[in-house]
Amino acid sequence: MKIVHVASELFPYVKTGGLADAVASLAGMLADSGHEVAVFLPGYRAALEHRDAAAAERRYRLKVEMGQQYLSGDVRVFSPRPNLSIFLICREEFFDRRAPYGNGERDYEDNSDRFIFFCKGVVETLRLADMQADVVHAHDWQAALLPLLLREAERRQGGMLAMKTIFTIHNIAFQGIFPRAVFARTNLPDELNSVDGLEYYEQINFMKAGILFADRVTTVSPRYAEEIQTPEFGCGLDGVVQTRESDLVGLLNGVDTKVWNPATDPLLPARYSRADLAGKRVCRAELLKRFGFAPDFDGPVFGMVCRLAEQKGVDLVLANQGFFLSQSCRLIVLGAGELRYETAMKALAARAPNKIALSAKLDEAMSHLIEAGSDFFLMPSLFEPCGLNQMYSQIYGTLPIVSRVGGLVDTVIDADQQPEKGTGLMCEPTSASLLDVLARAMTLFDDKPRYGTVQQRAMAREFGWNVAAAGYERLYRDTL
C-alpha cells in the first residue's frame, strides 16, 4: 500500500511527547513491511537542522490560499531509510522557531494559521506530486483538517484526490480551538461553519473536523476509546465521538525495540537483559551519581519522566512530598513544562537535595538512564490515552506505578491484586491512593524475592510495534 502520515511531530526530528515516537515507530514498521510510506511534517528549524535533512531536495513550490490571500512556501523531501520519505512543509514565518507550539508559557498566537497552512500545504503537495495514496493517516488536532480538506479538494477537482482517510486521537484534551473568525482562513464552504461542521460553542474546533469527516477514527488504546465517549474523559467532544462509535477503534501503541531495549541501548553505561541484570545495577549507581546521591544507596529509587503538567499527576506527587521527605528513598524527576510545576518541583528539590532531584529539561539520554536505573517508575496520570513510559519501564525491569486510567489499564497488571500475573502497581488518580501505592511499593521493594519475580515477569512482556502495526494494516485494508 501507499500510506501517507501527517503529523506535527516525528522522532528524531522534533519531539515534545509520545506523538513523535508513535508516528515514527508506526511509519518505520510499515516501511520495513514493504509499504511505500510518506510522512508530512512542518518544516521546523529543528527538522531542517537535523543531519538527515542535509540532503533534502527542494522539490515543490507552494501557493496556499488562506482567506483573501495566497501564502507561499516550499516542500523539501528526503529519505532516511528504504520505503520511507519525509516531506517538510516549509514557510519560515510559521515554522522557523525554537519550539513547535509555543514559547513555554503560552501557545503561539498564530497556531491556527500555522496548521491551516500546513494541512493545506499537504493537500497541495499531494496534488502537485500526483501522489495517489491508498490511505492518508492524520494525527491529532494539528492535522485534523486533512480529511475535510481532502474531501473538499476531491469534490472540486473531480476525484483527483480521492483517498481514504484515518484520523487518530492521541490526546483529546488538546483540540485546536480558535475564534470563529479563523474559519474564513480555511476557505471551506460556509455550511461547515456550523454545529454540524467545525463550530464549537461559538468557536471552531479542528479536532472535531477530524472526528467527523475521516473515514475511520482511531485512538491509542482500547480503554481510551471507551473513555473519550464519556463526559469525564471526552473533554467536551464525547457526544461527537459517540456519533462515530461504529467507526472508532482503539489500537494500543507499541514500543520501538530498536530504540528501547536494555540489551542493546547505546545510551546506557551498561547493557543488561532479563537473564543478566548486572548492567542494571551499574545503571542504578550511575543514575544516583549523576544526581549527586550516594551510588550505593540501598533504598528504592523512584523515577519520573514527563511533561510537568496537570495531566501527568504532578499535583499528586507534590501533595505526597511528605512521603519522599520522610522515607528512605530517592525521587528523580526529569521534565519541563508548565512554569508553576517547574517552580514547585525545583523548590521541593532545593528543600531536600539529599533525597529529591529535578532536571527541568528534555534529555533523551537521561530518560533512558532513569528508566534503566530506577526501581520504580511513577506515572500517576489523571488521564493517559496510551502512555509509553510504563511499557519502557517494564522492558527495562523498572516496575511502573500508574493510575488506573486509559492505556495504563491495558498495559500494567497490579502485583497485589493479581499476584501471579502482576507487573507493576496501580492506584486511583488521587493523592490518597498514590500515598497508599507508594507504601505498597516500599513493602514490595523490601521483599527482594517477590520484587525479583515481578521484575522478571515485567521484562518478559512483549510491547513491540509489530502487533500495533499489524492492527493498522488490517484497518487500512478494511477502509479501502
UniProtKB/Swiss-Prot annotation:
It is an enzyme of class 2 (transferase). Pathway: Glycan biosynthesis; glycogen biosynthesis. InterPro entries: Glyco_trans_1, GS/SS, Starch_synth_cat_dom. One of its GO terms (biological process) is glycogen biosynthetic process. Keywords: Glycogen biosynthesis, Glycosyltransferase, Transferase. It catalyses: [(1->4)-alpha-D-glucosyl](n) + ADP-alpha-D-glucose = [(1->4)-alpha-D-glucosyl](n+1) + ADP + H(+). ADP-alpha-D-glucose binds at residue 15. SUPFAM superfamilies: UDP-Glycosyltransferase/glycogen phosphorylase (SSF53756). It comes from the Bacteria. Its EC number is 2.4.1.21. CDD domains: GT5_Glycogen_synthase_DULL1-like (cd03791). Transmembrane segments: none annotated. GO terms for molecular function: alpha-1,4-glucan glucosyltransferase (ADP-glucose donor) activity; alpha-1,4-glucan glucosyltransferase (UDP-glucose donor) activity. The keyword Thylakoid does not apply. Belongs to the glycosyltransferase 1 family. Bacterial/plant glycogen synthase subfamily. NCBIfam families: glgA (TIGR02095), PRK00654.1-2 (NF001899). Synthesizes alpha-1,4-glucan chains using ADP-glucose. This is Glycogen synthase. It comes from Opitutus terrae (strain DSM 11246 / JCM 15787 / PB90-1). The lineage of its organism: Bacteria, Pseudomonadati, Verrucomicrobiota, Opitutia, Opitutales.
